[in-house]
């Protein structure tokens, strides 16, 4: 919110400077055209001062509202650009990106998941034994939106397994030793699996957390940074310069317990330190309804 105010002040200052300059030029032109206009100035100085104050008050309100509207309407902030490569922070909803106007580039949308790539969603803890994926996480919302039936969830499991086999990913021996009762293989933090629930959507499932034997998620800032670097490496090798969209990770129900602002700064810093992997447009997505809690400026 503080940065939104700072941006508002910046826009406001620029508008003030422009309008004052314009008024100065206009006054000079009027004085040049009508040289006798100020001969009787002393006679009505009070009235002129009063009118001048009213004009500046009105001008202030106009500039303020224009600045406020400009701040509200601006949805993105490009923080780095070099040729056709860029890093941008945007206000948006990642689940609405695929349905927007199509362009020549694909959109690769990141979904943070666990190292087992679980697909069992917890909607009712009284009915689900050892619930895994919360419906309130991006992981859970993704599954419920695109794989709402048991047959579709089974198809998702198959798609994940086939992709893991295709890429030759091997189970993480350290995790397998740590959690010996795992019902599924566990893969390294930062493992990326691409799935395509519809013809016009491309999602990258990014492993950022581990589930223990009781299905409690465990993660950390170190896991987050490691997974982000792995994601950027994957993007560089596999996404052919198409657009990448990364949501804020490690907030809400995550065990990392980051604020939106903290998550944004970690993601931003990690990308800025690995720009050699950016060969397209990388977008950090802040949920559009969270404008009041985190600024993109």
PLM features: residue spans?
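Macrodomain-like recognition of ADP-ribose-binding/processing modules
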Residues: 2-297
């Amino acid at each position: 919110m503080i940065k939104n105010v700072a941006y508002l002040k910046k826009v406001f200052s620029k508008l003030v400077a422009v309008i004052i300059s314009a008024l100065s030029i206009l006054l000079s032109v009027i004085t040049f055209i009508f040289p006798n206009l100020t001969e009787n100035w002393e006679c009505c100085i009070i009235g002129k001062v009063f009118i001048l104050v009213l004009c500046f008050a009105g001008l202030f309100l106009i500039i303020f509202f224009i600045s406020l509207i400009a701040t509200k309407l601006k949805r993105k902030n490009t923080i780095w650009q070099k040729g056709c490569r860029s890093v941008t922070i945007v206000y948006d909803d990642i689940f609405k990106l695929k349905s927007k106007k199509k362009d020549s580039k694909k959109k690769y949308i990141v979904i943070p998941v666990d190292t087992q790539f679980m697909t069992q969603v917890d909607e009712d803890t009284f009915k689900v034994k050892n619930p895994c994926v919360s419906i309130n996480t991006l992981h859970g919302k993704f599954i419920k939106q695109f794989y709402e039936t048991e047959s579709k969830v089974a198809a998702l499991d198959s798609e994940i397994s086939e992709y893991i086999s295709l890429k030759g990913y091997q189970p993480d021996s350290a995790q397998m030793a740590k959690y010996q009762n795992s019902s599924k293989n566990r893969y390294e933090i930062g493992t990326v699996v691409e799935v395509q629930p519809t013809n016009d959507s491309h999602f990258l499932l990014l492993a950022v957390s581990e589930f223990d034997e009781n299905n409690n998620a465990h993660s950390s800032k170190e896991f987050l940074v490691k997974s982000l670097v792995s994601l950027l490496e994957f993007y560089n090798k596999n996404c052919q310069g198409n657009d990448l969209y990364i949501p804020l990770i490690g907030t809400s129900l995550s065990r990392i317990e980051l604020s939106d602002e903290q998550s944004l700064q970690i993601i931003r810093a990690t990308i800025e330190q690995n720009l050699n992997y950016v060969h397209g447009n990388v977008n950090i997505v802040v949920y559009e309804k969270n404008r009041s809690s985190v600024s993109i400026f």
